[in-house]
Amino acid sequence: MSEDDLPDGCDYLIEDAVEALDNLDEEPVAIFLDDAWARPQRAQQFGVEYDTHPFDESQSGLRDHIDTSITTTEIIDKCYEVLADGGWLIADADDWLLPRLITYLQEQWGDVASSYNGGGYRKVGGVTYLSSDGNPDKSTAGMYLSTGGYPVVFAHKGETDRQSSVSARQVADRVREQYGWGSVKPISPYEEWVKGLVSPGELIAVPCAGTAPAALAAERMFGDEAQYVCIDVESDAKTAFKQRRANEINSYKQETID
């Protein structure tokens, strides 16, 4: 166990994402990125109570509460640099980030969805939230149609032997317990993607981690063989993660025993 009571091979760092990725001792085979800060014009609006940052350095007309010291493209570039050859990027997005992220990946990583050769942008999947009656959730606020979930972008570094028939589109119940954190995403979709693209004992990285559902998914799937590094600049994120882990992992272990 680490000093944070995490299993050997698992860590949660309070650091800048780019710097922490640069200092990894091992190449991750998958990076699960949730860059919730990439919504510059929503800073301090629509429930976004934290500072945000631009997608790239060319973005102009920015409001207050926007951190221009880092951009989404810097994080994406670093992900590509540190990923193992054939490794996957699984990136949560939203309506604003999705087209920009896809275009950037196509231009910088490649467009394997078009060429069927090499690597780069592969596919858009997503998570659809279910309501209590099992139908798609319609409670997401919004005047111009509700979202009821979020898109997820899949890309890989160069050609890859990491293949899976797991669906890129998953359904899940909305997480009700927030653990003092603003946005908590379900674990079950990431269990499927971890199971499909990662093997026990292989490292995954989770920058901009929050409560890090992908890390908890790896721990559920692989137990003591899980290997992950979570990264966030907010110490409250780590506190929320530890609370969630204590609840989710213990509950999961009890379910498997029962």
Q: Which residue stretches match the model-derived regions?
A:
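Haloarchaeal acidic low-complexity proteome signature biased toward cell-envelope/secretome components but also
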Residues: 1-8, 247-258
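Core catalytic lobe of class I
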Residues: 2-231
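The DNA-recognition helices of helix-turn-helix-type DNA-binding domains
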Residues: 221, 245-248
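Conserved SAM/SAH-binding beta-strand->alpha-helix loop
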Residues: 234
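Conserved SAM-binding loop
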Residues: 241-242
